[in-house]
Amino acid sequence: MKYHIHKAVVIGSGTMGAAIAAHLANAGVPVTLLDILPKDAPPDDREARNKIVNDGWERCLKARPANLMSPELKTLVKLGNLEDDFGVVAEADWVCEAIVENLKIKQKLMARIDEVRKPNGIVSTNTSGIPVSAIAEGRSKEFRKHFLGTHFFNPPRYLKLLEIIPTKDTDKDSVEFFSWFGEYRLGKGVVLCKDTPNFIGNRVAFGTGAFAMDYILKNGYTVDEVDAITGPLIGRPKTATFRLIDLVGLDVWDHVGRNLAPLIPHDKLGQEYLKAEAPAKLMSTLLERKWLGNKTKVGFYKEVRGEDGKREFWSLDLNTLEHVPPTKLRFDSVKAAKDVEGLGDRLKVLLEADDKAANLVKALTYQSFQYASSIIPEVADTVKPIDDAVRWGFMHQAGPFETWDMLGVRETVKRMKAAGYPAARWVNEMLKAGIESFYQYQRSSPTDKRRAPRSGIADKNGEKVGVYDVVKGKYIKLRKPEGAILLKQQKVVSQNSGATIRDIGDGVACLEFHTKMNALDEDIMNMADEAFNRLETNFEGLVIGNEAENFSAGANLFMMVVGAQQGMWDMLDAAVRKLQNLNMRMRYSPKPIVVAPAGLALGGGCEITMHASRVVAAAETYIGLVELGAGVIPAGGGTKEMLRRTVNPFMRLENAEPLVTLQRAFLQMGQAKVATSAEEARGMNILTSADRIVLNRDHLLSEAKKEVLHMVASGYKPPAPEMIYAAGRDALAAIRIGAWMFQEGNYITQYDHHIAGKLAYVMCGGELTRGQWVSEAYILDLEREAILSLFGEERTQARMWNILQTGKPLRN
């Protein structure tokens, strides 16, 4: 390969630079982070000379959510300064500049890099507002061939968007390679951008955000009202509008908006709202007060302690500029829309209503369509880069044109015009030509009898195969993602309301869950049983995975708590046995079963993962045995499996004592600890060294299938049955004493202590007089006995109901 990236350098240790370096470490790329020398730094004091970069990296390590997927990854990051350590630039395969947004300073740095850059070494800038081509002015031809913009969104670990901006001089091979590197190594959604002001993501965000702020102030909306309306209800994150500005920082938001306005004199729609008087006056006042948002702990929201000592977030009164307690909001349109599942159908309910909330949704929706269409073909020739940038950069459920397709383009254009937000001319020309949608769609698998996915696009559920090209005036073919499997396009083998078995080709099947939060219920268990049966005769291997936000949030608590309160003990016993049996069947399957978790994999979802032949996990997998928070213990084989992984290896050593490793596993389950990444899950013995981690979620199922095929080709054999070391009553007594001390110190409640005692009993093998090796079935029986007894306790039932009603654990 002409290009590779084995070593990288990031210059600039501010918020973005340090976070980019951290994400390179997440991807396994050794990186050196450089910054300037402090003024008057002594020549022989390394610590003093590296103070700026050391401080920047320290802030990065302390940031929450964490920039690194595991603390151990920091060993991949070296620190230095631009005088003593500039030599590393000559060895780097990629140099990423993330310094102050000043053209002259950037150009001066590029001149230094040009002198030492290695042949085929790629150089990029993370600028968000300066023309990329201007930064490379005056540089050598070879430098300019290997120079481009790489605009990450903050924080780089969590936001998928990477805008790549080539100049007219950038070599095509450099662009293709870095696009591949961004997608496959860094796990990014890559959008190729023209070198236009603020590229695509921020151009759309500030063109629509400036309008939103002006409309909100003119029409007397409160901060609470706006954020209640403009979050998940309309397909946007919980940060909605004002929480997002607090997160970004009011100073950053204002700076980007002010810098954008003079760069787009031709953009009348953007100019009108970026220069609006009321928002400018508000922002100026808040900046004078140093109310910058989360970084100063006060902005549009302020954290206060209520009379009961609990945290509350008070919102800013936009008239008095004082923070006020939160208020409960009631809008008929919002109440009606909340009961509707699909985003398109939910928006239709809001757009057809006529109250204050509905009017805000109409204005924001129609203006976003108007503005996004107005900047084509300036920023892109098709709608897809804009949709991708909005989804990946701002975590919207759908981009503006995907949303427009949901609502029906022709009908929406009429409504927009009537509301005073006319669509761009090219949209009307498209409709005149008889083209009714921005995308061409291919129907889903005809054998799929399920309704549209909850997160899907209403009436447009097929795969996108084409997109309207504004310049050419016709659909052009969309490139099929090479590293992705789209389940809805795969043949359905069998299906019920909880799960589907699909044939994903090459002798591999996929078991897909699709209950709410993918909670494990009887339908999923039955379909899993069928999948294992079909695997024996019809397939070479099986993937268990899905395309939902979360792999599985665990067992169906509603079924469990209702069953307990109605005394349905046979049903509960059968349900627990079935999960245990399925997991054991999976562990000893003669054919490989690869589990592909992503998002939440909690409780039973974690237990399924731990019994796989192998795991191929998305990097952003949040996994753990959390049952104690619901008033029970892991009983689908999770307790048994944790003992096998933590205690067994240690007890095979000579003169080993089990207590230390046993206590570590006990605390992990007792505290219901959740790994904050797949990498961290490895350190918790939930994933093993043989399991794989995939940074790009879109590639997860494809990589899981590849793993199945590799295991088949390698002659996969299941593991031999294994005995479990049970430490006996002496270890049980020691753990019980530790739990009692936690209770006495008010770290846990009396009922926490009671549940912990049940867990300890199972982990130690009950009241065995001495430590001994026991069968897996012995521990599974203890798991089942413990959970059934806990189901019958009122305080466990109260914990379950609280999670169902509030989503939060109850400490009773």
Q: PLM ranges: what are they?
A:
Residues 1-542, 546-549, 557-591, 598-602, ...:
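N-terminal glycine-rich phosphate-binding loop for ADP-containing cofactors
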Residues 606:
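Short glycine/serine-rich donor-binding loops of glycosyltransferases
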